[in-house]
């Protein structure tokens, strides 16, 4: 990939700088001892998202609001990283993705499945990302944050690369925005990895990620969705009868064309209800829906894009729409059952599986029976109440606060995953087995801080054998002198890199082994 080398050097120049006055010469180990006391007025926090749809930015906004309530944070800045890149890159990431969703959803599903295993991303893709994000790297460098929180995998990878090259000293937290864990999000090094549910955490642990680095937070949503509200007052604001169940039909921010089909079916319903149709940014869709409900306007309220979705969710009885990570989490936080339509292959299909499994949603596999599904639920108030209770049970309205507070509890240093350990995790994921069931030489060992028990690095047992580690070893001494002796041996280069990361400026250190 000779053609890419100049651009890789460009990225390296963007992150290269002399150590700042607050960066101890000893590297991350020495730095950790003083963190987070470098800024006497509080921490500098950077929240990075990507505007591929609205969800990643909404999660980032929820975290930003939660951080604003905490006394330890001096400054918090939120950046949509796509806004720092060139127009072609933005269109590829955003417009290109939604074009595939509309015209070739099977490609989206294939892409999701192909990157479902961790550490599988092609070098060419990494090079392309680096080429187009040099401006972002400079912004991160200039802001010099203590804490970086990422709600998209792209900035997480870039920040991890800066940490690995010792060009940034900060705590990195990665926050997933769907109910399942996708391996594309896993990077190294990082401090905290936040997932939406227990099964996702269990899956990550089975692949060898230390459990102390995985936190089940839920997906951050705007605060207050679970709060009690004056239903009558909100209903009056929208011209709704509080005595009737309200069906909230969402086209999403982009205005999904499927909405018109749903409205036509619901219009023929004989159940007593009112419907609020949110058409997003599509003015044409709003006009089409207005025309479709002509003559029955007392049952329908047609809106364009609105910032009042939270209030509408609080007073509604049923939500009809796509199972995006954020919209689904908002519904669950509000105790609002869902009728799921048109899930995008990959993450939205998995979100739908989870919601149906938990009894908080039903899924429409036929576009012709959406009205039938809605009628069935409206005719069975007991079932609707049970679904609402299930939604509240799995909802996590305080996920933003959970992430903010936990991210500030900085561990001693980021977790390092060696290249051989990455290969083992990838292999286990592709074979569909826990990493513990791999052959003995590829099994993973976690190096820990003997004083705190915190995980510091993951390596294969075979890698550690030159340091005298056996399958029954409970600790390992790692002297810099031994690493120097191994550096000319190609088979041990990965161990040398891992050891140098762990030692920082120390000559020798003893680590626990699990």
Tell me what each language-model feature is:
Residues 1-33:
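Compositionally biased, low-complexity flexible segments
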Residues 5-8, 38, 481, 491-492:
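Intrinsically disordered, low-complexity polyampholyte segments enriched for Lys and acidic residues
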Residues 8, 32, 36-279, 283-444:
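Nucleotide-activated sugar donor-binding and catalytic core shared by glycosyltransferases
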Residues 24, 431, 477-479:
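Low-complexity, intrinsically disordered segments with a bias for serine/threonine
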Residues 25, 31, 448-450, 462, ...:
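Serine/threonine-rich, low-complexity intrinsically disordered segments
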Residues 445-449, 455-459:
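Short linear proline/tyrosine/threonine-rich motifs used for host-factor recruitment
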Residues 454, 465-514:
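Membrane-proximal basic amphipathic "stem/tether" segments
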